[in-house]
């Protein structure tokens, strides 16, 4: 007669296999070329061909201090920080498919747009811009991005099927 262990051992085997698969699906990205995280989060996380970049504020990567000055300088610093995170995974702004911009003053929208456009020269990604009451360390702008690796986003053609 064989002992009856029930389903419990099977459940643990499946659970452990699932946890291992999840761990293999997520890669944490960190580069010294961008500011270190100022909280319990990563600069970016990659799952398959998707890269999720945490919001960047205008911190100098070397000093960790906020870049002072006008919204133009802050926006450039933020986008340069994002470029460094993308570069850590051999990606560029051409790989970005979605951005979210957080501004403390929508009066800065036009200036941010002009600078943003100089980084996204062709086929700009989908984007949301929202005004918030405050950002960490007194920043005036924060931007987060989602990027696709391996050129996946440019290999698909969309067709209008409405008519």
Model regions and ranges:
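Short, Lys/Arg-enriched N-terminal segments with co-localized hydrophobic residues
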Residues: 9-24
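Short, polar/acidic, helix-capping and beta-turn segments at strand->helix junctions
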Residues: 25-163
């Amino acid at each position: 007669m064989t002992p009856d262990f029930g389903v419990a051992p099977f459940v643990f085997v499946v659970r452990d296999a699932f946890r291992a698969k999840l761990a293999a699906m997520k890669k944490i990205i960190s580069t010294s070329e961008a500011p270190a995280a100022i909280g319990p989060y990563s600069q970016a996380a990659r799952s398959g061909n998707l890269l999720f970049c945490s919001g960047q504020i205008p911190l100098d990567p070397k000093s960790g201090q906020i870049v002072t000055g006008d919204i133009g300088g802050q926006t450039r610093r933020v986008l340069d920080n994002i470029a460094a995170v993308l570069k850590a995974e051999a990606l560029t702004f051409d790989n970005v498919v979605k951005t979210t911009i957080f501004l403390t003053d929508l009066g800065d929208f036009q200036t941010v747009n002009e600078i943003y456009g100089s980084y996204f020269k062709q086929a700009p990604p989908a984007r949301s811009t929202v005004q918030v009451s405050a950002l960490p360390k007194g920043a005036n702008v924060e931007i987060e991005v989602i990027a696709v690796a391996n050129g996946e986003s440019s290999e698909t053609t969309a067709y209008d099927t409405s008519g």
